[in-house]
Amino acid sequence: MSDLTRRSFLTWTGVGALSVAAMSLAGCSPSGSGGDGSVRFAWWGGSERQQAYLEALDAFTAKHPEIKVAPEFGDYDAYQERMTTQMAARDVPDVFWIPSAAVLTYRDAGLYRNLDGASGLDLSAFSAEQIESFRLDGELNTLPKSLFSPVLRYNATFLEDEGAALPEQLTWDNLAEFLLDYSANNADGRKGVSYGPYHDMPFESFLRQHGEDLWTEDGALGASVDGVGAWIDWWEKLRHAGATTTMSEQDGIEPSWPQVGDKVLTTFANSNHIVDEAQAFPDYEFDQRDVPALEDAAAGYHFTYYSRFAMYEGVPDERVEAAAQLMSFNLNSPELLSLVGLSAGAPPNAELLDQYEPDATPDEKKVIAITREIAETEQRPRFEAPAGSGNWRNLLIRELEEVTLGEKSVPDAAAAFVEAVEGEIAGA
């Protein structure tokens, strides 16, 4: 953290970063619920993202000296715990990032302020069609802070070493054949892919290719037992054939990237992950491409995920314009993008992305390329996770553990997953 940023942080909050987290988790804000007129801004991430955003907030307040910003941040899990506490106390930050599984949960809890016509909010970079796509059930109550899509990432260095190339038109069948062949024949004993049926966005793409949706418009689980079973079965065939890392090699169902990154040719991921994860193995070149497709994939299966942020419905009227200006800064500022980069996804503002591209890192340019490629595809509507579904990934991991331990068949695990998720939604 720069000296300027540290001074600004202490000026904004009056306490250190650990105190911010501790006070927030206790249900009381370091900014006194904005009682001093500060705009409270909450986000998640590691130390590098925290520093980048603090530096960006320096730039924002330099341009808007009349606006004070009180930052609140933590890692992803701590952020969600803090938000739960703040929701219960109705002490929510003025502007806040929204975890993917909580978009409708937060809406149903009444956290979002309607942004239609909000003074200070600049949406001039977006078309009317884009703005319509941002709405939830017709209401403009959240905005995308970044966007990304599922991809297949691969180690281009490993491919070159073997004199190999991925199939030009990737299908689930020909990718499986390729991974089996690579695992059996590469000179260094690497595996074709890390065991990854826990990857949520590739899973959703797989379902959509089968004509299903992960979530339906009316807030139900759209995935069928057959759809879930087909997904797990694709992975299990590879695992049993030795084409994936073993559970011991990746230390369980959900490995960290440093555990497996030099052991595999490919991994499924989100399009933005390459920015940070490639840095873990600087001696290798990584690239990425669209996920495989069924030969008879349902039309419009592609999707772009909006990572959203919002303004709290309880922001006092006299602070709405300042909060909206901070949101506009997040949407439109080249300076902010130059500081935070694309590790959290590409900006939804295409003009901003065009401006940034000449200075993007090589890995960020790969994010830009796939973002533009997928933006050109046909995309049918995608629906957010309903209230009560926030634990669905853990439920999937639980069933995958049962399968890999030999304690459940794939059909039984798929049925148990569907039953458990439906039960949690019904009980919400």
Regions found by a protein language model. Name each.
Residues 59-126, 161-163, 256-266, 280, ...:
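Extracytoplasmic "Venus flytrap"/periplasmic binding protein-like
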Residues 179-180, 219-248:
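Glycine-centered hinge/linker elements that transmit conformational signals in sensory
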